[in-house]
Design a protein with these regions (language model features):
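Short acidic active-site motifs
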Residues: 87, 262-266
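Active-site neighborhood of phospho(di)ester-bond hydrolases with catalytic His/Asp-centered motifs
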Residues: 48-50, 72-80, 89-91, 140-144, ...
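Short, charged N-terminal beta->alpha structural module
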Residues: 227-249
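FMN-binding flavodoxin-like domain, especially the glycine-rich phosphate-binding loop
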Residues: 152-192, 196-199, 219, 241-256, ...
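Metal-dependent catalytic neighborhoods of phosphoester/phosphodiester hydrolases
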Residues: 86-91, 204-205, 324
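Metallo-beta-lactamase
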Residues: 4-8, 89-129, 173-179
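Active-site metal-binding motif and surrounding structural segment of the metallo-beta-lactamase
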Residues: 43, 54-91
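Conserved beta-strand hairpin/beta-sheet module of binuclear metal-dependent hydrolase folds
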Residues: 3-63, 131-134, 138-142, 235
Length: 364
């Protein structure tokens, strides 16, 4: 068990899954993930959520170690996604079915010295989600909110993997997150205990501010993401020329090769930066599939409030810009640059003026 200290009477009993390669069977997690669970020891004992079925034995070992022959009185179920609910079926509380309590907004559970206040958080990011505020030690048990990828045994900066987690897991539900943040703003919070990632104790305003920015679909950084989907490398060559020009102008720029790089990280950067340039090759009368996949993901996650430039490549009938524009148009508050670039198979000197005009426009 990770040596995570919360308090004398609130214990961490979660587990790391350092060997997991894909979270939700789609998101690369090179440093694994943690499944967090907590135990409140008081006159009444409460277990806060279970963990994924991959870690059943380890979790029960952690639980038994802290219980020391005591028997839990309550199991709090904040979120029914299987990575947190898989072990409810094995949790032996006598007469559990008859003792199920459906709680409502603002209701409290008296454990003795500790009191849990229940706060509903529907669609953050599942319909049934709730969070709990422990009034004595002023701890917010935030369910998947404020979570991040990465096992706790792997020490790393919070923001990058928390951002990638947020925009790919929770990002579609900005409005419900805003509602939860408003509720949380009325509480005196000293610690945040999520179901994934580290316990947050210091400088909580930093983490809350990030969630305010992310959930309101503001751009976290002024800058440009250049995203390329190139078949034979020629479209990528042009995209990298654009990257160089932007850097020469002092613009903060990120580049992603959609054919090779982590798509979830590309989605993260698309939301992070204020502007984006898409460089896509024409394919089968449309746009090359990695770009199409990327734009579908942005549609589903609520991409909005951005400026986007378009670059296409096509040998006979370039159509990528039209397809990309058609996919962007339904998105909310997207400004598409008037200047576009069309490459016929390979870059030629005559293309440079159009590239320069697009870069100038995206910079202003």
């Amino acid at each position: 068990m990770n040596n995570v200290i919360i308090s004398d009477s609130i214990k961490y009993i979660g587990v790391d899954d350092a060997t997991l390669d894909l979270f939700e069977s789609q998101y690369i997690v090179p440093n694994g993930v943690s499944y967090n669970s907590y135990l409140i020891l008081d006159e009444k004992i409460a277990v806060m959520d279970t963990v994924d079925a991959r870690k059943t034995k380890e979790w029960f070992d952690n639980l038994d170690k802290e219980l020391k022959e005591h028997v839990p009185d309550y199991l709090i179920v904040s979120h029914l996604e299987p990575d947190h609910s898989a072990n409810i079926q094995f949790f032996n509380i006598e007469g559990l079915d008859e003792r199920c309590i459906v709680v409502k907004e603002g209701e409290e559970l008296d454990l003795g010295n500790h009191h849990l206040k229940f706060i509903m958080a529907p669609m953050v990011h599942w319909p049934e989600v709730m969070v709990e505020y422990e009034t004595t030690e002023k701890i917010l048990f935030s369910a998947d909110g404020f979570g991040k990828f990465g096992a706790l045994s792997h020490d790393e900066d919070w923001a990058c993997e928390a951002r990638r987690y947020y925009f790919n897991i929770v990002g579609k539900y900005g409005a419900p997150v805003q509602t939860l943040l408003k509720k949380a703003s009325t509480l005196d919070i000293k610690m945040i205990c999520p179901l994934h990632g580290p316990i947050l104790k210091d400088n909580l305003g930093y983490y809350i501010d990030k969630y305010q920015i992310w959930s309101s679909y503001q751009s976290e950084d002024e800058g440009v993401l250049v995203a390329s989907a190139s078949i034979h490398g020629n479209t990528k060559e042009v995209a990298l020329k654009v990257v160089d020009l932007l850097k020469e102008k002092g613009v903060k720029v990120a580049f992603t090769d959609l054919t090779r790089d982590d798509m979830a990280e590309a989605v993260e950067d698309a939301f992070r930066y204020s502007k984006m340039i898409l460089a896509g090759a024409t394919y089968d009368g449309g746009v090359f599939s990695p770009m199409e996949d990327f734009l579908h993901r942005l549609q589903h996650k609520g991409y909005q409030n951005k400026t986007v430039g378009l670059i296409e490549n096509g040998s006979w009938a370039p159509l990528a810009n039209k397809v990309m524009k058609d996919m962007l148009t339904p998105m909310k508050n997207i400004t598409i640059c008037e200047n576009t670039v069309t490459i016929k198979s390979t870059y030629k000197d005559e293309n440079q003026e159009a590239i320069n005009q697009l870069v100038e426009e995206i910079c202003h």
